[in-house]
Amino acid sequence: MIIIVIVVFLFYFSFLNLNLNPKKKRPPSPITLPVIGNLISLLNNQPQNILFNYYKKYGKIYQLQYGIVNTVVLSEFDILKEAFIENGEVFIERYNKITKKFKSSENIVNSNGLIWKKLQSISIQELSPNIKIKKYEPMIINETNKLIDSFNEHIKSNESIDPTLNIKICFLNIIISFLFNFRYNDYKDEKVIQLVDYIHSIFRMGSHPIPQDYIPILNKFYINKTTKIHQKIFENIYEYIENQVQKRLEILNKNNNNNNNNINECFVDLLLLKFKSNLLTWNEVIKTTTDLMIAGSDTNSLFTIHLIIALTNRENIQNKVFNEILNFYILNENNKITFSNKSKTPYYNSVLKEVERRFTVSPLSQPHRTNKDIILNGYFIPSGSQIIQNVYSCHLNDKDWENPFQFNPDRFLNNNQLEKKLITFGMGPRNCLGFQFALMSIWIVNLILFKSIKFSSNKLIEEEIREGGTTLSPFPFKINLIKR
C-alpha cells in the first residue's frame, strides 16, 4: 500500500512540475487518471480511431500518459517532418517495451545506437540501390504468375473465393526468395500456411496493450497471457529462420570450397558473409532475417488485398486501370515488365497511392523515443518520451487532404506534391529500409494481376470495419474472379 502511495505521489509531482513550469509548456492532453494515465485508450482494438478523435480535439501534437511512460502523438505531415527530418537525430531511437525483450535488440527494427547503424549499413547494400533490387524483378513476375495459376480452378468453376491466403503466400514466397533463394511450390503446403498464420497472429497481437510495459511493478506479480503466446510464436519463427539460414551457410561453404564466385545469391548470403568476417553475430543474422520476412510479407499482401477490395467496389476505376495496363503491354517492347517503366502507367500509379492513403495498413507505425529534451512546435518534450507517428491521422486529416474519406485517385494526378505526404514507410533515418523493394513488388504483382483477372462481387465489400492490430486487415470476404 505504501509503495502505491509513493508511486502516485511521484507521478503527480512530476506531472505538476512539468506542466506548471512556463519554460516547459507541455502539449495538450486529455484527462489523465492516477497510475494508469491514459492506458484506457489502448484497450480498444482500434486504437487509431481513439487517437484520431484525440487529434480532432487536441491538434497535430498532443500528449498521453501510459502509466509511467510519457507519450507524444504526432498527427500531421508538417509536425512529423519537423520531428523526423529536421530533428531526426533526436527522434532516431526505437522505444522498446519491457515485455518485448525476448525479441532482443540485435535486429534491424528494435536496435539502437551502434548495433542499428551496423545492421542498417549492411542491409542497405542489398535493399537500397535500384540496380540491386532490379535483379529480383523476374522472380517477382514468376511468383505473380504462380499466384494467378492458383486462382485458375476458381476461375474455371466460377466459384467465389477469398483471395487473402493466396495473396499472402505470394508475397511470403517473394520475400523468402529474396532472403533464401527458394520458394514454396504448392500454395496448399501446410508449412507455408502455418508461416502465414504465425505472421498474421504476430500483427494481430502486436497492438494489444500489456500493462507491464507501462507499469513495470506489475511484472513482479504476473506474466501476461498474450506475452506468452507472442513469445512462443516468435520462438517458432526463429527456429524456422535458423534452419533456413543454416542451409544457406552450408551452400555458401560448399560454393566457397568449389571456388564458385557466384556465392552471394540472396540477402542472407550477404549477412552470412559478414558473419564469417566477424562483422555480425549469429543472433544478428537470425533476428534481422526474421524482421525482413515478417514485415516484408504482411504489409505488402494487405496492401494488395485492400486494393482488390477498393477496385471490386469501384468497377469504373478498375476498368480504367485495366485499359491503361493493357495499353502499357501493347506499347511496351516485348511486353517486358520493369519497375523502371512505371512512369508509363500514371493512373494505375495514382490508384496505388490512393489505396496507400485511404486504407492505411500500418496506422501507428513503430514507436520512437527521444534521446534528449527538445522543443517541438513550441512544446517541451522530455528525453525518453515515447513518440508515435500517427500515420492514420496524417493520411486522413482535412488539412492535408481535400475530402479525405473519399476515394479519389485523381488527387495524385493533379498534384505531384501530395505523394510526399504519404508516410506509410515512415520518415527520417529510421524509415523502412525495404521500401523500394516493397514498392517494386506491389507495382509488378498488381500490374500483372489486374491485367489478367477482373475482380467482381454482387454486393459491396466492407471497407471501413477492419480487424485491428499493428496492421489493419480486412475481415474475410468473397469475390468472383473472371479471366481477362
UniProtKB/Swiss-Prot annotation:
Disulfide bonds: none annotated. Heme binds at residue 432. InterPro entries: Cyt_P450, Cyt_P450_CS, Cyt_P450_E_grp-I, Cyt_P450_sf. It is found in: Membrane. PROSITE patterns: CYTOCHROME_P450. One of its GO terms (molecular function) is heme binding. It holds the Pfam family p450. One of its GO terms (biological process) is xenobiotic metabolic process. The chain crosses the membrane at residues 1-21. Its EC number is 1.14.-.-. Keywords: Heme, Iron, Membrane, Metal-binding, Monooxygenase, Oxidoreductase, Transmembrane, Transmembrane helix. It is a single-pass membrane protein. One of its GO terms (cellular component) is membrane. Belongs to the cytochrome P450 family. This is Probable cytochrome P450 555A1. It comes from Dictyostelium discoideum (Social amoeba).
